[in-house]
């Protein structure tokens, strides 16, 4: 039976994602906090927080789930040609806080953002502890795009991306894919399907199939050098 759970500030297990509501799609639990151990437990089980500043913390596990397979992100011929002409630089874990701030800026026709100060503080702590990571796109010394997310074993859980120049967020996605392939990651969790993700090649999986893949790869060892801050060259 579908049901909504209410969490308190004592650490407790999340309910099974199978119990998430169908309307709104994937809402599983309300409350709790954003402590690192709770967040990591959530992602480990295919659950993530998503809420507005005026709301309590809401925990989700939607069905279907948007995912990418590293190597199958769609980098079109026209995008490759465009990126080859740009004098951009790409880095990993050089400016996590700034990337989160860029992602938190309200989008066009949006009044606010779900990446609240509370969310930013929580994920900055995860970054400090080696769990959350960023990709940066630079034009000179100016940050023009990027993305961030969490690594759970050989699964990268993407959270958000932004751009200040055309195609800069797509460039960040191309860099992420290249890096994950080199580090033998198996899955990118993109959470909720939208037209932009679909245009990049995201696939919609039944939640049960996603959880099966997550369970398969979440405990796999990762190269210790995978997330050392570095500058990378985008191979097109």
Swiss-Prot record:
InterPro entries: Acyl_CoA_acyltransferase (IPR016181), Leu/Phe-tRNA_Trfase (IPR004616), Leu/Phe-tRNA_Trfase_C (IPR042203), Leu/Phe-tRNA_Trfase_N (IPR042221). One of its GO terms (cellular component) is cytoplasm. Its main location: cytoplasm. The keyword DNA-binding does not apply. GO terms for biological process: protein catabolic process. One of its GO terms (molecular function) is leucyl-tRNA--protein transferase activity. It is found in: Cytoplasm. Keywords: Acyltransferase, Cytoplasm, Transferase. Its EC number is 2.3.2.6. The keyword Cytoplasm applies. It holds the Pfam family Leu_Phe_trans. It is an enzyme of class 2 (transferase). It catalyses: N-terminal L-lysyl-[protein] + L-leucyl-tRNA(Leu) = N-terminal L-leucyl-L-lysyl-[protein] + tRNA(Leu) + H(+); N-terminal L-arginyl-[protein] + L-leucyl-tRNA(Leu) = N-terminal L-leucyl-L-arginyl-[protein] + tRNA(Leu) + H(+); L-phenylalanyl-tRNA(Phe) + an N-terminal L-alpha-aminoacyl-[protein] = an N-terminal L-phenylalanyl-L-alpha-aminoacyl-[protein] + tRNA(Phe). NCBIfam families: aat. Functions in the N-end rule pathway of protein degradation where it conjugates Leu, Phe and, less efficiently, Met from aminoacyl-tRNAs to the N-termini of proteins containing an N-terminal arginine or lysine. Belongs to the L/F-transferase family. PANTHER family: LEUCYL/PHENYLALANYL-TRNA--PROTEIN TRANSFERASE (PTHR30098), LEUCYL_PHENYLALANYL-TRNA--PROTEIN TRANSFERASE (PTHR30098:SF2). This is Leucyl/phenylalanyl-tRNA--protein transferase.
């Amino acid at each position: 039976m579908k049901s909504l759970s209410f969490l308190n500030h004592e650490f407790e297990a999340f309910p099974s994602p199978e119990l998430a509501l169908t309307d709104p799609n994937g809402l599983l639990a309300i409350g709790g906090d954003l402590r690192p151990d709770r967040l990591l437990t959530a992602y480990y089980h295919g659950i993530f927080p998503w809420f507005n500043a005026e709301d309590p913390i809401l925990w989700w596990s939607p069905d279907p789930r948007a995912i990418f397979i590293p190597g199958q992100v769609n980098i079109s011929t026209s995008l490759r040609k465009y990126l080859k002409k740009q004098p951009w630089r790409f880095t990993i874990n050089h400016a996590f806080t700034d990337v989160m701030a860029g992602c938190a800026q309200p989008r066009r026709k949006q009044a606010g953002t779900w990446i609240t100060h509370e969310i930013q503080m929580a994920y900055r702590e995860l970054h400090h502890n080696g769990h959350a990571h960023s990709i940066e796109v630079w034009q000179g010394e100016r940050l023009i795009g990027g993305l961030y997310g969490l690594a759970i074993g050989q699964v990268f859980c993407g959270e958000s991306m932004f751009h200040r120049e055309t195609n800069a967020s797509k460039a960040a996605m191309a860099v992420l894919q290249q890096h994950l392939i080199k580090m033998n990651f198996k899955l990118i969790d993109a959470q909720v399907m939208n037209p932009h993700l679909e245009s990049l090649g995201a696939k919609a999986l039944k939640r049960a199939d996603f959880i099966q893949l997550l369970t398969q790869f979440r405990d796999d060892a990762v190269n210790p050098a995978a997330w050392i801050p570095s500058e990378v060259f985008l191979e097109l």
